[in-house]
Amino acid sequence: MNSSVSTHGTGDCPVNCTKSEDFAPSKLGTKEYWDGAYKRELQTYKDIGDVGEIWFGEESMHRVIRWMEAQNISENAAILDIGTGNGMFLVELARHGFSNLTGIDYSKAALELTTNILVEEGLKNINIQVEDFLNPSTELKGFDVCIDKGTFDAISLNPEDREEAKKHYVTSLRAVMRPNGFFIITSCNWTKEQLLEIFKPGFELVRELPTPNFQFGGVTGNSVTALVFKQTD
């Protein structure tokens, strides 16, 4: 069975996109929702080999990897995919020669899907583990590059206490990264200015990665924001 990429929703944000501080909490911010979603995707993969959605489309992976290659990030750099989902970003990183890869997710169903895909792709040396990033294990540390493509968006929809969840996320991020490490985030719920404010403690902006523009009512904007931060302390 050859893995195939889903043709549905690959360019869309999967987590209730709206660039506003006032977006409402949602079931999309719950573990139960993602467990159910990945159980369905796992069954679909077993049935027809469809890996499921590539969050924000395949270009969202390529723009991050282009930046990493332009910065001469070592192929041996320790890279963490936060909320790896189906693991396709890990697959793409491996295809580009990166060899020290870790993917985490709090959904066991997601990691079962990831495991199936990695086996099919013949990738044996990628580390995947169940982790709640808001309360990570002490062993999760020492990463040169951390990548988030939609996970912070989902966490921001937590119906219980999203403000605390955001703070815990930043704390966890600082704990797992090496000094001067890079954090690359792709978001459709937060603007550049909002992300700068959220990650101001301990991070500085290195680069805004180009994303597709849209025009509506004579106004030009971006539906997706992609930023590279560097840890400063």
Swiss-Prot record:
InterPro entries: Efm4/METTL10, Methyltranfer_dom, SAM-dependent_MTases_sf. This is EEF1A lysine methyltransferase 2. The keyword Transferase applies. Protein-lysine methyltransferase that selectively catalyzes the trimethylation of EEF1A at 'Lys-318'. It comes from the Eukaryota. Keywords: Cytoplasm, Methyltransferase, Nucleus, S-adenosyl-L-methionine, Transferase. GO terms for molecular function: methyltransferase activity; protein-lysine N-methyltransferase activity. Its main location: cytoplasm. It comes from Danio rerio. It is an enzyme of class 2 (transferase). It catalyses: L-lysyl-[protein] + 3 S-adenosyl-L-methionine = N(6),N(6),N(6)-trimethyl-L-lysyl-[protein] + 3 S-adenosyl-L-homocysteine + 3 H(+). One of its GO terms (cellular component) is nucleus. CDD domains: AdoMet_MTases (cd02440). Its EC number is 2.1.1.-. It is found in: Cytoplasm; Nucleus. Coiled coil: none annotated. Belongs to the class I-like SAM-binding methyltransferase superfamily. EFM4 family. One of its GO terms (biological process) is peptidyl-lysine methylation.
